[in-house]
């Protein structure tokens, strides 16, 4: 396949993938990407403490801000077009019936432009970021496939890595990446890890895999700049480039190419300076001041134990869960690639072999990530281009070997290569459309089915739903949810680790004793005149109340039984959930006016 065909295929596939997503995976999907962009574009939304304290770079959310501006422009253009039509209709007033029917018709014509603008803008806000992520994911996978081809031609001893017959291995890599479960489930979600994976794939493709011969090339300069920018978005990305950079330096020293070594140092400095300047400019645009979120991120996550506030996982989490989940059904070939060296001739020795370098990067990154207390599947996602490279090359070698031998059972094994991709895509589709879909659907409902509301409240674990990036309503009254602020006052205390063990945020206090929390922080729900005179409450009962079924059964249904609240809508969310607090349906209550 031609490169253009590969890119077109990937984009169309990921666009379908992105538009099919109806579910929620983790809070960062919305709160660390879409919400800051929505705040910047429209002037309202929710900013988490990380954004309030400058721990995050705005480079990734800026992509969505641009899509929001496109949505706004399309909305305005739609309104102007319909207003022109309305004026034309008014000029043709003679054909409009007289009387009440004519007045109603003209009123509808004049109101249509505003309603159409709101509708176009809203759907642009919902689907614009998905188109952006389809492009981001497709770009990352495109360069991952090109990387596989480039490595194959090099390790197959073809000489020039731009020549030779790499079509079979390219098609295999394309099939593996398009049907990979985690790619189908995760790649088009608005996580910065997907953006990081794409930057990593681009930089890896342009990297100097020749041992130093391409250090002076323009492509290698681009690789350094993109890699530096990726490290500024996610500091842990430096673990990839530190290993590859060390191999490159050792190769140059071993071959005594001192001039190229000096060129490398100069290019690294220039690329780093360029990336830092670009990042500072972007963050200045958002924060209104010069700062380096990288430094504040390191302060919180490295120099203090507060990163563990978001959870700890056993040392083997990445080894036994993250890697199998991300690699998917190609796992046997990935493991085989790590344990063997079946690829053809290539450069001899550890230093000169691109495959051995990749193995070192993968092993060391998994080991180092395993040393960090807070672990999530997505933290390893930037390694996906390398996972794909090892899996595709090993599978290609294995298929060639057994095809040449003509083994009878090969046909039975090959049938799995059709079944497993289908199962992989199906599993991702189910999770994308059904599991945890209720927390997204409820925001769509509150946007479309609630014409006005004095207040909307969410009594559930913090950040359980999207926010204004899906609600997109600045005409509502008070909008609130239970919070989960980390203990930032412990940042510079020596015993922060010990205090963290006993620290409880607001969500913890809520679920430790639901009745006590409600009675302490809310006024009586039955009558306004029952509240204690002069007493201030943390929350007021909202007009629309949103809870999980777990909360409803544990407390809320019985508590609200004799109040003005009635259940008005229920959304399926999960059959089961690893966090029991989020189990069951999402329920919406509505409170009629006080009597």
From Swiss-Prot:
Its EC number is 2.4.1.-. The keyword Transcription does not apply. Its main location: endoplasmic reticulum. It is an enzyme of class 2 (transferase). Keywords: Endoplasmic reticulum, Glycosyltransferase, GPI-anchor biosynthesis, Membrane, Transferase, Transmembrane, Transmembrane helix. InterPro entries: GPI_mannosylTrfase (IPR005599). The keyword Transmembrane applies. It is found in: Endoplasmic reticulum membrane. Belongs to the glycosyltransferase 22 family. PIGB subfamily. Mannosyltransferase involved in glycosylphosphatidylinositol-anchor biosynthesis. Transfers the third mannose to Man2-GlcN-acyl-PI during GPI precursor assembly. This is GPI mannosyltransferase 3. It comes from Eremothecium gossypii (strain ATCC 10895 / CBS 109.51 / FGSC 9923 / NRRL Y-1056). The gene is GPI10.
């Amino acid at each position: 396949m031609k490169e253009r065909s590969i890119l077109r295929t990937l984009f169309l596939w990921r666009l379908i993938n992105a538009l099919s997503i109806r579910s929620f995976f983790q809070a960062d999907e919305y709160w660390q990407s879409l919400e800051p962009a929505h705040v910047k574009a429209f002037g309202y939304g929710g900013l988490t403490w990380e954004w309030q304290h400058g721990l995050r770079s705005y480079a990734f959310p800026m992509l969505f801000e641009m899509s929001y501006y496109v949505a706004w422009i399309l909305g305005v253009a739609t309104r102007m077009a319909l207003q022109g039509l309305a004026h034309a209709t008014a000029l043709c007033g003679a054909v409009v019936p007289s009387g009440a029917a004519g007045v109603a018709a003209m009123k509808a014509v004049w109101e249509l432009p505003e309603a159409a603008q709101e509708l176009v803008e809203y759907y642009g806000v919902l689907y614009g970021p998905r188109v952006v992520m389809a492009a981001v994911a497709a770009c990352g996978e495109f360069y991952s496939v090109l990387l596989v081809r480039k490595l194959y031609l090099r390790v197959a001893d073809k000489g020039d890595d731009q020549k030779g017959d790499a079509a079979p291995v390219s098609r295999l890599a394309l099939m593996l990446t398009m049907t990979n479960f985690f790619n189908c489930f995760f790649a088009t979600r608005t996580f910065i890890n997907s953006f990081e994976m794409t930057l990593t794939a681009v930089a890896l493709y342009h990297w100097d895999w020749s041992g130093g011969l391409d250090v002076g090339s323009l492509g290698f300069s681009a690789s350094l700049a993109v890699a530096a920018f990726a490290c500024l978005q996610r500091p842990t990305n430096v673990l990839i480039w530190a290993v590859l950079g060390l191999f490159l330096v050792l190769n140059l020293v071993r071959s005594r190419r001192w001039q190229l070594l000096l060129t490398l140092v100069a290019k690294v400095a220039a690329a780093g300076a360029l990336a830092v300047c670009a990042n500072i400019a972007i963050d200045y645009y958002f924060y209104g001041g010069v700062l380096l979120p990288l430094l504040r991120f390191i302060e919180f996550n490295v120099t203090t134990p507060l990163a563990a506030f978001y959870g700890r996982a056993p040392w083997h989490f990445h080894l036994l869960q993250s890697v199998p989940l991300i690699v998917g059904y190609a796992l046997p070939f990935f493991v085989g690639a790590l344990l063997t060296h079946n690829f053809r001739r290539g450069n001899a020795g550890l230093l000169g072999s691109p495959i051995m370098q990749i193995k070192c990067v993968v092993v060391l990154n998994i080991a180092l990530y395993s040393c960090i207390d807070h672990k999530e599947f997505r933290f390893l996602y930037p390694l996906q281009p390398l996972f794909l490279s090892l899996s595709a090359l090993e599978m290609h070698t294995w298929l060639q070997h057994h095809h040449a031998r003509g083994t009878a059972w090969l046909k039975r094994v090959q049938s799995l290569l059709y079944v497993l991709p289908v199962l992989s895509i199906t599993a991702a589709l189910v999770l994308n459309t059904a599991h945890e879909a209720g927390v997204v659907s409820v925001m769509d409902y509150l946007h479309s089915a609630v014409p006005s509301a004095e207040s909307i409240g969410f009594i559930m674990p913090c950040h359980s739903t999207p926010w204004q990036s899906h609600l997109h309503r600045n005409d509502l009254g008070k909008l609130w949810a239970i919070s989960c602020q980390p203990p930032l006052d412990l940042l510079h205390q020596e015993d922060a680790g010990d205090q963290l063990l006993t620290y409880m945020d607001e969500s913890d206090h809520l679920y430790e004793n639901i009745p006590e929390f409600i009675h302490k922080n809310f006024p009586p729900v039955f009558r306004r005149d029952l509240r204690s005179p002069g007493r201030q409450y943390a929350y007021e009962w909202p007009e629309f109340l949103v809870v999980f079924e777990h909360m409803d059964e544990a407390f809320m249904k019985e508590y609200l039984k004799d109040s003005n609240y009635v259940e008005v809508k229920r959304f399926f969310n999960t059959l089961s959930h690893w966090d029991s607090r989020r189990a069951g349906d999402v329920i919406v209550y509505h409170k009629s006016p006080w009597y």
